[in-house]
Swiss-Prot record:
Name this protein carries in UniProt: Transcription antitermination protein NusB
Similarity comment text for this entry: Belongs to the NusB family.
GO cellular component assignments: cytosol
Keywords for this protein: RNA-binding, Transcription, Transcription antitermination, Transcription regulation
GO terms, biological process: DNA-templated transcription termination; transcription antitermination
């Protein structure tokens, strides 16, 4: 599997783990150990998890947890006034938190790659407007934190 595909699998696994932490109230160390031992690259209930870059997975997961107090206000600022962060479901919050973490902390990864990867993850969970929301929020955040966007300004 190509390096980029392993990172994509790590991003998806990180979003799933963040969701699980949010819903079940699990801790980051417990979830990281569970995913690395039983999920990444393994078969679970007949479904095969893609092989993932475990280091990338850990970096996203621990980074989001450590920086959530910084990440959430950035997301709130990028959302429209009628869409508070608390109104978003756990999956969407996990996608946005992971994407914003990478935009803020992983300057070695191009904006277009980050936005595209997380929009694709959103498309795996949603069919309607949520992928567009992920695109718009991450584009706004990228303009704010990196001074560059992916496309038209959705503000």
């Amino acid at each position: 599997m190509r390096h980029a595909n392993k990172r994509g699998a790590a991003r998806l696994a990180a979003v799933q783990a963040l969701y699980q932490m949010d819903v079940a109230g699990s801790g980051v160390f417990e979830i990281t150990a569970e995913y690395e031992a039983f999920r990444l690259g393994k078969e679970v209930d007949g479904a095969l998890y893609r092989e993932a870059d475990a280091q990338w997975f850990r970096a996203i997961l621990t980074g989001v947890v450590e920086d959530q107090k910084t990440i959430d206000p950035v997301i709130r600022q990028a959302l429209t006034d009628d869409w508070p962060l608390s109104r978003l479901d756990s999956t969407l919050r996990a996608i946005l938190r992971a994407g914003v973490y990478e935009l803020m902390k992983r300057e070695d990864v191009p904006v277009a790659v980050i936005v595209s990867e997380y929009v694709d993850i959103a498309k795996a969970f949603y069919e309607e407007d949520e992928p567009k929301l992920v695109n718009a929020v991450l584009d706004r955040v990228s303009r704010r934190v990196r001074g560059e966007g992916r496309g038209k300004d959705a503000s």
